[in-house]
Protein backbone atom coordinates (compact mmCIF):
# COMPACT_ATOMS: atom_id res chain seq x y z
CA UNK A 1 0.00 0.00 0.00
CA UNK A 2 1.05 3.61 -0.40
CA UNK A 3 1.26 5.96 2.57
CA UNK A 4 -1.56 8.29 1.48
CA UNK A 5 -4.68 8.26 3.67
CA UNK A 6 -7.84 7.91 1.59
CA UNK A 7 -9.82 10.15 3.95
CA UNK A 8 -8.19 13.49 3.26
CA UNK A 9 -4.83 12.79 1.63
CA UNK A 10 -2.81 12.80 4.85
CA UNK A 11 0.29 10.68 5.47
CA UNK A 12 0.08 7.24 7.08
CA UNK A 13 2.80 6.52 9.63
CA UNK A 14 3.56 3.68 12.02
CA UNK A 15 3.53 4.85 15.65
CA UNK A 16 5.45 3.43 18.60
CA UNK A 17 2.70 0.85 19.21
CA UNK A 18 2.97 -0.46 15.67
CA UNK A 19 -0.36 1.04 14.62
CA UNK A 20 -0.64 2.64 11.18
CA UNK A 21 -2.38 6.01 11.61
CA UNK A 22 -2.90 9.19 9.62
CA UNK A 23 -1.16 12.32 10.85
CA UNK A 24 -4.11 14.57 9.89
CA UNK A 25 -7.22 13.08 11.48
CA UNK A 26 -5.86 9.97 13.22
CA UNK A 27 -7.59 7.49 10.96
CA UNK A 28 -6.17 4.04 11.65
CA UNK A 29 -5.36 1.63 8.83
CA UNK A 30 -5.28 -2.15 9.16
CA UNK A 31 -2.79 -3.45 6.56
CA UNK A 32 -3.87 -7.06 7.11
CA UNK A 33 -7.47 -6.33 6.09
CA UNK A 34 -6.63 -3.39 3.82
CA UNK A 35 -9.33 -1.25 5.45
CA UNK A 36 -9.58 1.70 7.82
CA UNK A 37 -11.02 1.36 11.30
CA UNK A 38 -12.82 4.71 11.01
CA UNK A 39 -15.01 3.58 8.13
CA UNK A 40 -15.58 0.61 5.86
CA UNK A 41 -13.24 1.98 3.21
CA UNK A 42 -10.89 -0.38 1.42
CA UNK A 43 -7.48 0.81 0.30
CA UNK A 44 -6.26 -0.16 -3.16
CA UNK A 45 -3.04 -2.11 -3.35
CA UNK A 46 -0.05 -0.94 -5.35
CA UNK A 47 1.07 -2.68 -8.50
CA UNK A 48 4.50 -4.22 -8.00
CA UNK A 49 6.97 -6.74 -9.38
CA UNK A 50 9.21 -8.99 -7.33
CA UNK A 51 12.73 -8.83 -8.77
CA UNK A 52 15.29 -11.10 -7.07
CA UNK A 53 15.77 -9.60 -3.60
CA UNK A 54 13.61 -6.48 -3.95
CA UNK A 55 10.24 -5.18 -5.11
CA UNK A 56 9.64 -2.71 -7.91
CA UNK A 57 6.54 -0.57 -7.34
CA UNK A 58 4.67 1.18 -10.13
CA UNK A 59 4.08 4.76 -8.94
CA UNK A 60 2.78 6.50 -12.04
CA UNK A 61 3.26 10.25 -11.84
CA UNK A 62 2.01 10.98 -15.33
CA UNK A 63 0.38 14.39 -15.59
CA UNK A 64 -2.69 15.06 -17.67
CA UNK A 65 -1.64 16.00 -21.17
CA UNK A 66 -3.85 18.84 -22.37
CA UNK A 67 -4.53 19.28 -26.09
CA UNK A 68 -2.05 21.62 -27.75
CA UNK A 69 -4.62 24.20 -28.80
CA UNK A 70 -3.00 27.54 -29.66
CA UNK A 71 -5.76 29.91 -30.81
CA UNK A 72 -6.35 33.00 -28.68
CA UNK A 73 -10.03 32.62 -27.75
CA UNK A 74 -12.46 35.11 -26.23
CA UNK A 75 -13.65 34.05 -22.77
CA UNK A 76 -15.40 35.80 -19.88
CA UNK A 77 -15.64 34.39 -16.35
CA UNK A 78 -18.11 35.97 -13.93
CA UNK A 79 -18.35 35.23 -10.21
CA UNK A 80 -21.96 34.55 -9.22
CA UNK A 81 -21.59 33.39 -5.60
CA UNK A 82 -19.90 30.82 -3.38
CA UNK A 83 -18.62 28.10 -5.78
CA UNK A 84 -20.63 29.32 -8.75
CA UNK A 85 -18.90 30.83 -11.78
CA UNK A 86 -20.44 31.72 -15.13
CA UNK A 87 -18.15 30.94 -18.08
CA UNK A 88 -19.14 32.59 -21.38
CA UNK A 89 -17.50 32.18 -24.80
CA UNK A 90 -18.70 32.56 -28.42
CA UNK A 91 -18.95 28.75 -28.60
CA UNK A 92 -20.44 27.72 -25.26
CA UNK A 93 -21.68 28.96 -21.90
CA UNK A 94 -21.87 27.12 -18.60
CA UNK A 95 -22.15 27.65 -14.85
CA UNK A 96 -20.61 25.73 -11.97
CA UNK A 97 -22.28 24.55 -8.75
CA UNK A 98 -25.06 27.16 -8.53
CA UNK A 99 -26.05 28.06 -4.96
CA UNK A 100 -27.46 31.53 -5.48
CA UNK A 101 -30.38 31.89 -3.09
CA UNK A 102 -31.54 30.61 0.29
CA UNK A 103 -29.59 28.60 2.85
CA UNK A 104 -27.70 25.32 2.94
CA UNK A 105 -27.00 22.65 5.55
CA UNK A 106 -30.28 23.21 7.43
CA UNK A 107 -29.68 26.97 7.86
CA UNK A 108 -26.10 26.31 8.99
CA UNK A 109 -24.66 28.07 5.93
CA UNK A 110 -25.70 31.30 4.25
CA UNK A 111 -24.36 33.08 1.20
CA UNK A 112 -21.69 35.63 2.02
CA UNK A 113 -22.57 37.88 -0.92
CA UNK A 114 -25.77 38.95 -2.60
CA UNK A 115 -26.17 37.16 -5.91
CA UNK A 116 -26.17 39.42 -9.00
CA UNK A 117 -29.45 40.57 -10.50
CA UNK A 118 -30.64 38.32 -13.30
CA UNK A 119 -28.88 35.17 -12.10
CA UNK A 120 -31.96 33.13 -13.02
CA UNK A 121 -31.62 34.25 -16.65
CA UNK A 122 -27.87 33.62 -16.51
CA UNK A 123 -28.41 30.00 -15.50
CA UNK A 124 -31.15 29.31 -18.02
CA UNK A 125 -29.09 30.78 -20.86
CA UNK A 126 -26.33 28.21 -20.28
CA UNK A 127 -25.58 25.33 -22.62
CA UNK A 128 -25.04 23.19 -19.53
CA UNK A 129 -24.44 23.38 -15.78
CA UNK A 130 -21.58 21.53 -14.07
CA UNK A 131 -22.26 20.12 -10.59
CA UNK A 132 -19.28 18.66 -8.75
CA UNK A 133 -21.02 16.70 -5.98
CA UNK A 134 -24.17 16.47 -3.87
CA UNK A 135 -23.38 18.72 -0.91
CA UNK A 136 -26.21 21.27 -0.66
CA UNK A 137 -23.93 24.26 -1.22
CA UNK A 138 -23.10 22.77 -4.65
CA UNK A 139 -26.18 20.80 -5.65
CA UNK A 140 -28.71 23.26 -4.24
CA UNK A 141 -32.35 22.26 -4.79
CA UNK A 142 -33.82 25.73 -4.23
CA UNK A 143 -31.51 27.35 -6.79
CA UNK A 144 -32.10 24.53 -9.27
CA UNK A 145 -35.86 25.02 -8.93
CA UNK A 146 -35.37 28.15 -11.07
CA UNK A 147 -33.65 26.15 -13.83
CA UNK A 148 -35.45 24.54 -16.78
CA UNK A 149 -35.64 20.78 -16.18
CA UNK A 150 -34.36 20.12 -19.72
CA UNK A 151 -31.04 21.82 -18.90
CA UNK A 152 -28.06 19.50 -19.56
CA UNK A 153 -26.16 18.84 -16.32
CA UNK A 154 -22.52 17.71 -16.45
CA UNK A 155 -21.61 15.42 -13.54
CA UNK A 156 -19.00 12.85 -12.56
CA UNK A 157 -20.12 9.27 -13.11
CA UNK A 158 -19.63 8.11 -9.52
CA UNK A 159 -20.03 4.40 -8.82
CA UNK A 160 -22.71 5.23 -6.24
CA UNK A 161 -24.64 7.33 -8.79
CA UNK A 162 -25.15 9.86 -5.99
CA UNK A 163 -25.31 12.95 -8.22
CA UNK A 164 -27.42 11.19 -10.85
CA UNK A 165 -29.98 9.92 -8.34
CA UNK A 166 -30.32 13.28 -6.59
CA UNK A 167 -30.75 15.22 -9.83
CA UNK A 168 -33.25 12.67 -11.13
CA UNK A 169 -35.29 13.16 -7.96
CA UNK A 170 -35.38 16.91 -8.71
CA UNK A 171 -36.65 16.27 -12.24
CA UNK A 172 -33.37 16.64 -14.16
CA UNK A 173 -32.83 13.76 -16.57
CA UNK A 174 -30.64 15.34 -19.27
CA UNK A 175 -27.39 14.32 -17.60
CA UNK A 176 -23.93 14.22 -19.14
CA UNK A 177 -21.96 11.69 -17.09
CA UNK A 178 -18.19 11.56 -17.45
CA UNK A 179 -16.03 8.91 -15.86
CA UNK A 180 -12.74 9.81 -14.19
CA UNK A 181 -10.48 11.51 -16.77
CA UNK A 182 -12.99 10.86 -19.57
CA UNK A 183 -13.03 13.81 -21.97
CA UNK A 184 -15.31 15.84 -24.20
CA UNK A 185 -13.32 17.34 -27.06
CA UNK A 186 -14.01 19.34 -30.22
CA UNK A 187 -10.77 19.71 -32.16
CA UNK A 188 -12.23 22.09 -34.75
CA UNK A 189 -13.39 24.62 -32.15
CA UNK A 190 -10.53 23.75 -29.75
CA UNK A 191 -12.76 22.83 -26.81
CA UNK A 192 -11.75 20.27 -24.17
CA UNK A 193 -13.46 19.22 -20.93
CA UNK A 194 -12.51 16.53 -18.44
CA UNK A 195 -14.02 15.64 -15.07
CA UNK A 196 -11.46 14.69 -12.41
CA UNK A 197 -12.13 12.64 -9.27
CA UNK A 198 -11.14 13.77 -5.80
CA UNK A 199 -8.21 11.85 -4.37
CA UNK A 200 -10.16 10.42 -1.44
CA UNK A 201 -13.03 7.95 -1.14
CA UNK A 202 -15.77 10.59 -1.21
CA UNK A 203 -17.96 11.43 -4.19
CA UNK A 204 -16.44 14.73 -5.29
CA UNK A 205 -14.96 16.06 -8.51
CA UNK A 206 -13.34 18.96 -10.33
CA UNK A 207 -13.54 20.20 -13.90
CA UNK A 208 -10.67 20.78 -16.33
CA UNK A 209 -11.20 23.10 -19.30
CA UNK A 210 -9.04 23.93 -22.30
CA UNK A 211 -10.38 26.45 -24.80
CA UNK A 212 -7.88 27.56 -27.39
CA UNK A 213 -4.75 28.56 -25.49
CA UNK A 214 -6.76 29.22 -22.29
CA UNK A 215 -6.86 26.53 -19.61
CA UNK A 216 -8.68 26.42 -16.28
CA UNK A 217 -9.09 24.04 -13.37
CA UNK A 218 -12.28 24.32 -11.33
CA UNK A 219 -11.13 22.55 -8.20
CA UNK A 220 -14.25 23.50 -6.22
CA UNK A 221 -13.65 21.87 -2.80
CA UNK A 222 -12.28 18.55 -4.00
CA UNK A 223 -9.59 17.16 -1.77
CA UNK A 224 -6.35 15.94 -3.35
CA UNK A 225 -7.90 16.27 -6.83
CA UNK A 226 -6.77 13.53 -9.23
CA UNK A 227 -4.05 12.68 -6.70
CA UNK A 228 -2.49 16.04 -7.69
CA UNK A 229 -1.63 14.64 -11.11
CA UNK A 230 -2.55 17.87 -12.85
CA UNK A 231 -1.29 19.91 -15.79
CA UNK A 232 1.84 21.86 -14.94
CA UNK A 233 0.78 25.14 -16.54
CA UNK A 234 -2.76 26.51 -16.27
CA UNK A 235 -4.15 29.93 -17.08
CA UNK A 236 -6.51 29.89 -14.10
CA UNK A 237 -7.23 27.80 -11.01
CA UNK A 238 -10.55 28.36 -9.19
CA UNK A 239 -10.56 27.16 -5.59
CA UNK A 240 -10.84 28.29 -1.93
CA UNK A 241 -14.38 29.56 -2.35
CA UNK A 242 -16.05 28.87 0.99
CA UNK A 243 -14.69 31.55 3.31
CA UNK A 244 -17.44 33.32 5.21
CA UNK A 245 -20.21 30.92 4.21
CA UNK A 246 -21.00 29.95 7.80
CA UNK A 247 -23.62 31.77 9.85
CA UNK A 248 -21.18 32.58 12.70
CA UNK A 249 -20.57 35.36 13.55
CA UNK A 250 -22.41 37.49 10.94
CA UNK A 251 -25.88 36.08 11.68
CA UNK A 252 -25.62 36.23 15.48
CA UNK A 253 -27.35 39.15 17.20
CA UNK A 254 -26.57 38.26 20.83
CA UNK A 255 -22.86 39.07 20.64
CA UNK A 256 -21.21 42.47 20.31
CA UNK A 257 -19.00 43.71 17.48
CA UNK A 258 -15.79 42.98 19.40
CA UNK A 259 -16.84 39.37 19.95
CA UNK A 260 -17.78 39.07 16.27
CA UNK A 261 -14.33 40.34 15.31
CA UNK A 262 -12.69 37.73 17.54
CA UNK A 263 -14.97 35.07 16.05
CA UNK A 264 -13.82 35.90 12.55
Regions inferred by a protein language model and the residue ranges of each:
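Conserved beta-strand hairpin/beta-sheet module of binuclear metal-dependent hydrolase folds
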Residues: 69-119, 203-220, 236
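Metal-dependent catalytic neighborhoods of phosphoester/phosphodiester hydrolases
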Residues: 34-38, 140-150, 165
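Rieske [2Fe-2S] iron-sulfur-binding domain
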Residues: 1-63, 140
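Cap/insert and terminal regions of metallo-dependent hydrolase folds
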Residues: 155, 227-264
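Metallo-beta-lactamase
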Residues: 40-73, 155-213
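Active-site environment of divalent metal-dependent phosphoester hydrolases
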Residues: 29-30, 102-103, 134-139, 161-163, ...
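Pre-active-site segment of Zn-dependent metallo-hydrolases
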Residues: 1-14, 91-130, 141-146, 224-232
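Active-site metal-binding loops of divalent metal-dependent hydrolases
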Residues: 3, 25-27, 83, 98-100, ...
Amino acid sequence: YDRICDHAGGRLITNNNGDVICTLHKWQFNPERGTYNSDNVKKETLEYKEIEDHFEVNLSEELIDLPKFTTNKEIEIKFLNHASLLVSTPDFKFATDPWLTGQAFSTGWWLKYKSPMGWEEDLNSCDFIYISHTHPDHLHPETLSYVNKSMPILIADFASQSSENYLNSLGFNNLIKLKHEETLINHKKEIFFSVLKSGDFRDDSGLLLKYGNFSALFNVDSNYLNYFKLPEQLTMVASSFAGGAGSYPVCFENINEKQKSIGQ
